Regions:
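Short, glycine/serine-rich, charged loops/turns that create anion-binding
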Residues: 28, 48, 135
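N-terminal G-site helix/loop of the GST-like fold
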Residues: 18-44
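Anionic-ligand binding patches
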Residues: 2-6, 10-22, 35, 57-188
Length: 188
């Protein structure tokens, strides 16, 4: 477990108490969002097995994953006796016909996934969880969460289009290889 300070001021401070929340995520995109919002935060890395809720609906899966990440981060913070600050977690999944699609393992896997979505409507779900620990007990965690679901219709895709998209390097660490450039393949 490591801490990494992210400050929006011109001088970055490492391992200080001068931050507002913990971000329990290693996602560069989530860090970028908080930086753009001028939130002072520290990254609290916690290893959490996201396969615990594989029998759940996509909605329940993403909600439970986000909440459990928050509880896991709280346990690490408490174990390491770190300052009691709120914890922010998030998770994004892509689902088609009730099946959850994760990050691609390689180029061939990414192309196969994208072709499965070709010409079809699917859901992108993001859950954000904000957890606070009771300052008196430092054990009870109160959590608030919100789930946003977006329905997206893909245009018909060819294997060549999918391969070219993979070569942009954008999709390699995202659920369903889903980066901003993929929007060119949405049916309008």
């Amino acid at each position: 477990m490591t801490l990494e300070s992210k400050s929006t001021s011109s001088t970055k401070k490492k391992k200080s108490n001068n931050f507002d929340i913990y971000l329990a995520s290693s996602s560069p995109r989530r860090s970028e969002i908080l930086e753009n919002l001028k939130v002072n935060f520290e990254i609290l890395k916690c290893d959490y097995d996201e396969s615990n809720f594989t029998d759940e609906s996509p909605e329940d899966f993403v909600i439970k994953n986000t909440q459990q990440k928050c509880l896991a981060a709280h346990a690490i913070r408490q174990q390491k006796k770190l300052p009691n600050k709120p914890i922010l977690t998030a998770d994004t999944i892509v689902a088609l016909d009730g099946k959850i699609f994760g990050k691609p393992e390689n180029k061939d896997h990414a192309i196969a996934m994208l072709l499965e979505f070709s010409g079809r409507r699917h859901s992108v779900m993001t859950c954000v969880c904000f957890g606070e620990t009771d300052p008196q007990s430092d054990t009870e965690v109160s959590m608030m969460f919100d789930l946003v679901r977006t329905e997206i219709q893909f245009a018909n895709l060819t294997a060549n289009q999918c391969a070219k998209y993979w070569e942009t390097n954008e999709p390699k660490d995202k659920a369903l290889s889903f980066g901003s450039l993929v929007s060119q393949y949405f049916a309008h």
